[in-house]
Amino acid sequence: MNAVLELDKTVVRRGGRAVLQVEHLSVIRGEVLAIIGPNGAGKSTLLRILGLLDRPTEGTVHFRGEVVDWRSPLVPLRRRMASAFQEPWLCDATAFANVALGLRFRGLPSPAIRERAGHWLARFGVGHLANRQARTLSGGEAQRVALARALVLEPEVLFLDEPFSSLDQPTREALVDDLGMILRQDHVTTVFVTHAREEALALGDRVAVMMDGQILQVDAPTRLFRAPISERVARFVGVETILEGRVVGQQEGIAVVEVEGQKIEVACRATPGATILFGLRPEDFTLASPEGLALASSARNHLLGTIVRLHPSGALLRAVVNCGFFLTALVTRQSAESLGLEEGGQVLVAFKATAPHVLRADLDKEGQTL
């Protein structure tokens, strides 16, 4: 792996308290590293360290394999980077002048400035707005100009700090799609901070989860969202049903787990007597009428429960079902209507033995690792 940026044993202290503790983090050349976490997790602090804007209290930062010397002038290194933020922060000038500004500071000749600024405005779909005053642009148009202004510099690293959070959903989705295409086509090394899981999935080659100033997991998006390494990560990435039970049987890689008197089959090699913690995502469940006890599917688990809450979740409905413990499932509005789902009504919940993701498994009675 060719790392552009690396942190080793990096700590930031404020008022005697550690607000950032990163044992190791690398940013690989050409990748988009998405950093997600709740507000106050330390994401922006981490971004400022990676961008060489703030010096850590402890630890080292490497850029292109060299240890950053904080006593030396850092402007030459910072000029190899670019940023875009939640607010576009455009100058009171035309869209073209805003994109051209950094090139003028670098002393490029006018023909080169015209060519590069025009090229990037066009790539972000705002070439026709080149002569518009920035103050007359919509939020989405202004953010496209801000991103063009950053990428026109051809930075070695692009930093994005919540660049979509102030946009409405249709505008945000369109810009995420367009930016993702550009970053992939040009292999732009990018560190992208967001609290939106769907944005991390759409853009990230890898995703880092931050909480309380620490990075808890770094992984490919599909693996992180399907296989979080802890309960805290699982809850943050949307694993809404987390259950704990005792293994009461095992056969051919399928453990029978007792949870609040219910038997659940889980694809894992935990041995009888062990306690496991596992999670299920809302989309793992299939809902059916109580009469459909013999569902024509490969699901090995069928639980009868009562709907305690049914509420909208975007284009779908989110159903909270009490099966002796609570499960959260997603269902289409059409399915809910055809099944006659309503709060207080009964429903059959089905899911495969491969759906549960084991978050923790205790040792068995012989002390063997599960």
Predicted regions mapped to residue ranges:
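The feature captures the beta-strand-to-loop junction immediately N-terminal to the Walker
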Residues: 36-38
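ABC ATPase NBD coupling module
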Residues: 67-82, 105, 224, 228
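Glycine/charge-rich catalytic "coupling/switch" loops of P-loop NTPases
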Residues: 261-311, 330-370
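Helix-to-loop junction immediately C-terminal to a conserved catalytic motif
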Residues: 51
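Conserved ABC ATPase "signature" region
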Residues: 111-129, 180-181
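A short, proline-enriched helix->beta-strand linker immediately N-terminal to the Walker B motif
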Residues: 152-156
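Conserved ABC ATPase signature
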Residues: 133-137, 141
